[in-house]
Amino acid sequence: IRAHNPEYVLILAGDHIYKMDYGPMIAYHVEHDADMTVGCLDVPIDRAKAFGVMTMDESGRVVRFQEKPEQPDPVPGRDDVALASMGIYVFKTEFLFDQLIQDADETYSDHDFGKDIIPHILESARVMAYPFREASTGRQAYWRDVGTVDSFWRANLELVDITPELNIYDS
């Protein structure tokens, strides 16, 4: 990263299935002058404890973040869903390096974005939530975490459905 000196760094999880143009998320990050932007989506409250769950204010700024909480906070006005992290992050490069260096020195840290870094920076940094939506409809886009054998199996069955929710072909 240092060799190329980018202004921003995009971090992705490797155990998810989705199709996303990252350009609008990066543009949102720049437009809001964020130090960090977290891709997010609504998940049913009963499944939210498997994810990082956040609360944002009316401007889209993340004000609370809990990694895999036992009692996830619901989205205000919608008791059936929580706002979950997709594990997709955009950082200002220097800010990212500063946080990684600081976290590396923390004896009791697991060195995990969701458990350690994000909750630690919320008060001092500008962390924004970016809701993942279909560009054409504005509806929540298809996204599946396939980090377990069961979730991987279910996602595969969805993708071979007669009319799958996600078109994996570019046509």
Stretch-by-stretch model annotation:
Residues 1-160:
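Unchanged
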Residues 162-171:
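Long, charged amphipathic helices and adjacent flexible linkers at domain junctions
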